Structures are given as C-alpha cells and as structure tokens.
C-alpha cells in the first residue's frame, strides 16, 4: 500500500506491505522504517533516520536484508535508487541506480526485481548485482508486480504491454514463451499470486470483479464479485493452502472468498435463470467486515485459519475472526505506530 505522495492522516506513514508469507509487515515512514510481526502484533524493528523518508520497504521473509527506496517530503535516498539494507550491520550494502523513479521492488533469495514505470529489470541478488532480464510493461505507475516466493517456482507476474493483460514469466527458464492472460478490459489495479505460484488473482481499476487464473495454462478458474459499485482494490491475498482469498478496497470493506470451493460463496437465488444478466449468477464473498475507520488498508490471513488482519493507513491494526457461516467478530484492535517494546 503506497501512500505517496501524501497521507491525509498526518502520521508519517508512507508505505505498508507484508513479507512473502504475511508473517511480518514493514512500514516506510517520513523518518525511517519499521517491521512488525503480523499475528500476534509486535514491533520487531524500528530504524529512525533523522535525515529522511522511506517510500518503499520490501522484506525477504524474516532475513536481515530489506530493499529500501527513498520517499516522502525529504527522501532518505534518491527515488531512482534501490538500497539493500543489512539489518545486522545497520547499513546499506548494495545500491542500484536507474535513470527513472523506482515504483516497487520484489525480492527472493537469488533475485532482485525492480519495477519502473514501463519496464521491469531482474538482477542477481549478489554483492555486485548483475542485470539478467528486462521486460517491457504498459504504463505501470502503481508498480504492479509479484514474484513467487516458493523456492521451487521462479514465477514473475506483471502487467503486459496490452491494457488489462498479465504476463507470467518463469525466471528459471526464460527461453520458454511467457503466458499472456487477457485478464480485464480495463487497466489493472491489483495482481496477487498464491504462495505456491499456481494461481494468480487479478482486479481492474473498476474493482467489481476478482478473477482467478491457473498460472501454467492461463485459464480462468473463477470469477468473484466484490460488489456492484466501482472500487479501488488495494490488496488481494490468499491463505497458506490457497483455499481462501481476502480483498480490501477503498470502500473500507475486507471481503473473504472461497477460492477452491465456490459453493461456499454466496449467490443470488436467481442465479439459475438463464435469461437474466450475468450479474445475477455472480459469486459473492461468504464473509466480509467493515474497517471502522474506513481508512485504506491491506489485508492478509492470520496465524489461525479463521483470522484476517487489516493494516490501515491511519495506523490502525484489526484482527477479525470469521466462522464457516461467514459471521465475523473483531478480536483485536491496536494502533501499531504508537507501540513500543515496553508496551508489549
């Protein structure tokens, strides 16, 4: 969740994002960065810079390396540089410079993937990074890109050169032709891989439909309806076994869908009437909850299989529990930016 160029809440938060298994989340601040354990909530690291802000933080699971990009009113680093921070040494150990602004960074143990506004560059994760690949994209100001964290799957997904298309590339064998998925007619707003890299979920700027595709064939598996009104989708994430997905939007709602068992999702009683528009046969979320503040948020599943966590731009942390019927209760609320080690 990128809150640049400005966060209306005035709390100094510029960016929030989960690590690869959603066990931690990192925050870029006007004065440094922070790392938290997701569930239970605990501040793990707080690095303050007197001289500047961090607009993007990318973790590599729980290891000591993080990718940082400068941001905010006074960026700590130039926005056209990726800095690899070693948290054991408390300093940057790798620096990669580009001719244009960096939109996002993705990491896996052997690769650094840098997203520019119409191009993606892949480097070795070594002390002197070597450029391996360059992929063209359509104009991509949100820096959409996902890299499968699974050690047996080197899949990289990003917007194709055609509007609404997703390109899937296997970084382990780039001689294979990429899989091109015409996911939506409109501009993409969100893409997400499951942890195994076998499924990709997509949403367009319209934000009413979530589509799930098989990554090896590119075939559509499911179409899920978030709502009837347009919305800006901030986040899509799946649980460990990819049976559920959660989706957050600017309507202040987090929806939970069954990704593998569509019968669990709600459907109109008019769904079987063939003469009615497709809308009536839509599969809706079986559970949803409202973030009380209505603030932009990212979401992920917690340590319990029936828990969903929401991390909000106003500094709020929510943990909701849902049951098989879709009933939802709030279990935990906290202000994560105000936490210190002595409070925990």
Curated annotation (Swiss-Prot):
One of its GO terms (biological process) is cellular response to starvation. GO terms for cellular component: lysosome; phagophore assembly site. It is found in: Preautophagosomal structure; Lysosome. Keywords: Autophagy, Lipid-binding, Lysosome, Repeat, WD repeat. SUPFAM superfamilies: WD40 repeat-like. A motif (L/FRRG motif) lies at residues 224-227. One of its GO terms (molecular function) is phosphatidylinositol-3,5-bisphosphate binding. InterPro entries: PROPPIN, WD40/YVTN_repeat-like_dom_sf, WD40_repeat_dom_sf, WD40_rpt. Its main location: other. WD repeats lie at residues 183-223, 228-267. Component of the autophagy machinery that controls the major intracellular degradation process by which cytoplasmic materials are packaged into autophagosomes and delivered to lysosomes for degradation. Binds phosphatidylinositol 3-phosphate (PtdIns3P), and other phosphoinositides including PtdIns(3,5)P2, forming on membranes of the endoplasmic reticulum upon activation of the upstream ULK1 and PI3 kinases and is recruited at phagophore assembly sites where it regulates the elongation of nascent phagophores downstream of WIPI2. The L/FRRG motif is required for recruitment to PtdIns3P. Belongs to the WD repeat PROPPIN family. Interacts with the TSC1-TSC2 complex; stimulated upon starvation. Interacts with RB1CC1. This is WD repeat domain phosphoinositide-interacting protein 3. The lineage of its organism: Eukaryota, Metazoa, Chordata, Craniata, Vertebrata. The gene is WDR45B.
């Amino acid at each position: 969740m990128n809150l640049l160029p400005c966060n209306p809440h005035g709390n100094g938060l510029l960016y929030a994002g989960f690590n690869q298994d959603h066990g931690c989340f990192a925050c870029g601040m006007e004065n440094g960065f922070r790392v938290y354990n997701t569930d239970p909530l605990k501040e793990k690291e707080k690095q303050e810079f007197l001289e500047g802000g961090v607009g993007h933080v990318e973790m590599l699971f729980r290891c000591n390396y993080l990718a940082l990009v400068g941001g905010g009113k006074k960026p700590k680093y130039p926005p056209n540089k990726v800095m690899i921070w070693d948290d054991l040494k408390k300093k940057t150990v790798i620096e990669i410079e580009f001719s244009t602004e960096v939109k996002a960074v993705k990491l896996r143990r052997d690769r650094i993937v840098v997203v520019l506004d119409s191009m993606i560059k892949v480097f070795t994760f070594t002390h002197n990074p070597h450029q391996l690949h360059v992929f063209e994209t359509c104009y991509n100001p949100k820096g959409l890109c996902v890299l499968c964290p699974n050690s047996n799957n080197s899949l990289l997904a990003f917007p194709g050169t055609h509007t609404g298309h997703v390109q899937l590339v296997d970084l382990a064998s780039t001689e294979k032709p990429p899989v091109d998925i015409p996911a939506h007619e409109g501009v993409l707003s969100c893409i997400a891989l499951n942890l195994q890299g076998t499924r990709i979920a997509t949403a367009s700027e319209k934000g009413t439909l979530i589509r799930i595709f098989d990554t090896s064939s590119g075939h559509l598996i499911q179409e899920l309806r978030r709502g009837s009104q347009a919305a800006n989708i901030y986040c899509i994430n799946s649980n460990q076994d990819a049976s559920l997905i959660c989706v957050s939007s600017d309507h202040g709602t987090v929806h939970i869908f069954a990704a593998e068992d569509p019968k669990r999702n709600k459907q109109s009683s008019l769904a079987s009437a063939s003469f009615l528009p497709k809308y009536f046969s839509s599969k809706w979320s079986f559970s949803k909850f409202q973030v009380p503040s209505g603030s932009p948020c990212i979401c992920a599943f917690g340590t319990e299989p029936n828990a969903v966590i929401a991390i909000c731009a106003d500094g709020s942390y929510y943990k909701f529990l849902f049951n098989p019927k879709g009933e939802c209760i709030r279990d935990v609320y906290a202000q994560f930016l105000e936490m210190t080690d002595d409070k925990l």
